[in-house]
Amino acid sequence: MRDQKIEKLLSIAGNENRYQYFVLILFLILWINCNFMAPVLPYLEREPIVEHNNEIKTLFFEICQNSTNYKIIQRFGYSWISEFGIECNKFKIGLIGVFTFIGNTMGSIAFAIIQRYLSHKRILLISSWGFIFSIYLSTTIYNIEYFIYILISLVFMGLFGDLLCYSSLVVCEEIVSSNKRALFSSIINMGYGLCGIIFSFIFMYVQNWRYDFYIAIGLSFILYLLIKFCTYDSPRQYIDNKDEKNVKIILQGIARFNGIEKEFLEKYESEEYQKLIREIMEYDYDESNTKNENEIEMKDIDNKKIDDQLINSVEKTKPPEKKSLSCFMSLKYPSLRYKFLILCILWFGTRLISNAIALYSKALPGNYYFNIIVLFTFESFAYYVSGVLINVHFLGRKGTLYVEYLIITIGFLLLSFLKFPLPVELSLNFIIRFCESAIELVYFTYTLEVYPTPVRSTNFGINVTFGNIGSIIAPMIYEYVQSWMLLLIFALMTLFHSFLLIFLPETEGKPMVESIDELCNDKNNGKDSN
């Protein structure tokens, strides 16, 4: 397989040495920072009267005695709705969450498009500045008259935050060895849960939303510098375009980071590895197979080479040619079509259920901070456990999903038909949330593995877009559907998702698919369930 040859080529740069662990830690911190709005947003929408009844009474009493009381006002200015005085305007409160999800959806769509024109590292660098600017914009607003700028900043935060997350995940998936791919993906996704714990504690003790935003700005700038000077693009992107010069520069940079640059140059110039490079670079699609698929002529696309040459480094090269196939072209291939459509459905349903359950859990009685922190703690643990389970051979990706779907289906049915004491209800909710987060982690890993390199990023971005649409719809369904009926619907949806998994291939222990041709030649694709 071509992927095995590429992994052998990556190994001479010491790809399994400290560079991949540096990237893992860097992108974990990036995910913690980019997702900081996940725990912060509920607090910004929280009405202070609910949390501080006694202090509200004190505020009213002191207002009767004095025309102003700065300390009390400062105490209550910890959220957007209190600072802008929109406690009674449910429409504006609702817009805060809606515009955030709109930004997330725009980010996944943008990723599916611009990754065909820009390298992943360049996307990371541009998005870092956009993310910093959008956070800064929201922290400079003090007047309700400019509330629209808050909403605009939320859109840009969601857009650039998603671009940072998805680009970093793709880079990590493509540079690490196949036996560590799922584990690394799960650790990076743990950033979402860890950010919930970290920023919730900050919010709980500081109770001023601006501090969380200032921390995110400072951390974003540090991450930008580390990405710019200490990381490299995925070489697969340039291998796909047969750009050997950039591939060498990237691998040489990784070898330099690992302290084995001299050994790398010696091996790279050896006859063995030069032959390996020629085999990788001269690889072409078998046109007979693609014609048999749908009689589509791909020769012009597959044989196109990049004419722009590197001047000094990968940073100064022009973006790769538009060799990646669009998702609409990939729909013409039966081998890709059903995978793409099924994953769109699975992403939509998974995100819809996940966000609705999050809203359901946050509405439970008890200490609000405690519920949020426990919820995100469960999510972090779920990502790690799921990352371990999907590497177990007899479970794999699909087996893990079946087990998790079974657990949450039982949980939904119990909650929809039976009444439990509060501790039991809380426990069932956290178990369901645990499994739902684990399922989402599996799809992050699985989606990138199931597609060949030419369409991997594009189709991944479109699949996540469908998931974000589900996130937008979730609050409306949660608001207008009775809880027992909602849980029953979710139970039926999980059963339907389990049925759809039958038609998808197992990817555990298999190399990443590098071409449409490899996908067409895999007779077991779409039929394996082991």
Question: What role is predicted for each listed range?
Answer:
Residues 399-442:
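C-terminal transmembrane helical hairpin of 12-TM major facilitator-type secondary transporters
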Residues 90, 178-187, 453-463:
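Loop-to-transmembrane helix entry/capping segments in MFS-fold secondary transporters
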Residues 148-163, 424-438:
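Hydrophobic core of transmembrane alpha-helices in multi-pass small-molecule transporters
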Residues 157-187:
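Cytoplasmic helix-loop-helix junction between adjacent transmembrane helices
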Residues 1-13, 49-76, 231-335, 510-530:
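Intracellular cytosolic loops and amphipathic helices of Major Facilitator Superfamily
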